[in-house]
Amino acid sequence: MLAIISPAKTLDFESAVKNFPVSQPHFTDYSEQLIEVCRKLSPQDLSSLMSISDKLAGLNAARFAEWTKIHNENNSRPALFAFKGDVYTGLDADSLSEDDVIFAQSHLRMLSGLYGLLKPLDLMQPYRLEMGTKLANPKGKDLYAFWGNVITQAVQQAIDAQGDNVLVNLASDEYYKSVKENQLNAKIIKPVFLDNKNGKYKVISFYAKKARGLMCRYLIQHRLTNIEQLKEFDLAGYWFDSASSTETEFVFKRDINE
């Protein structure tokens, strides 16, 4: 069973990280091509392209300038511990055991606009380049054109290594679009998280993102090996609703009190 998640815009390159046997990102040749494109853009260009403040644009221009193809523990950190958005709050990597992290290295992948696909212990340098960015490049008008079939093939290789042909899609639509689902040989499960607010169950973005991380954590800590086990997910008050679910979309509901 393989789970895929999105990266995060919020990064942490300051706090201490446990000593794990790190791995190298696989697609740095591709990353280098994107960096070269980004280095030609001014902070003003980046601000407009990414819809970010001048301050953030300046920071990311500096990051692109400093990025190097050589990744080591002086200029990089493992991806699982570098991302700090809502999904990663739910995943809470810092509290995972060493065995959990080693399991995750085989069963979890992070999609990335710059790196394509990352294993949890792959080293990465700080960057901001969302998959939906309309960055013109030698291969087309955006990052979907740039990555083409590369990410899909890498995901398939990771699925093949599992031996059960199951992919759990916990990524956002923006990032999952980089995976060409019709080219995958896999049973694909998409968990959906609904919260009851004002008497109606619906997707509430903040809660749904955190729940995706919680599902990753559950899959890792319980060493899940088959689809039926996913239905037992019960963290943070969620429960599986069989009546609302299909063979490929697993619906989890929760009642929240505000």
Swiss-Prot record:
Domain of life: Bacteria
One GO cellular component, as annotated: cytosol
GO biological process, one term: response to hydroperoxide
Disulfide-bond pairs as recorded: none
Membrane-spanning parts: none
Signal peptide extent: none
NCBIfam families listed in its UniProt record: PRK02101.1-1, PRK02101.1-3
UniProt record similarity statement: Belongs to the UPF0246 family.
Protein name, as recorded: UPF0246 protein CGSHiGG_08495
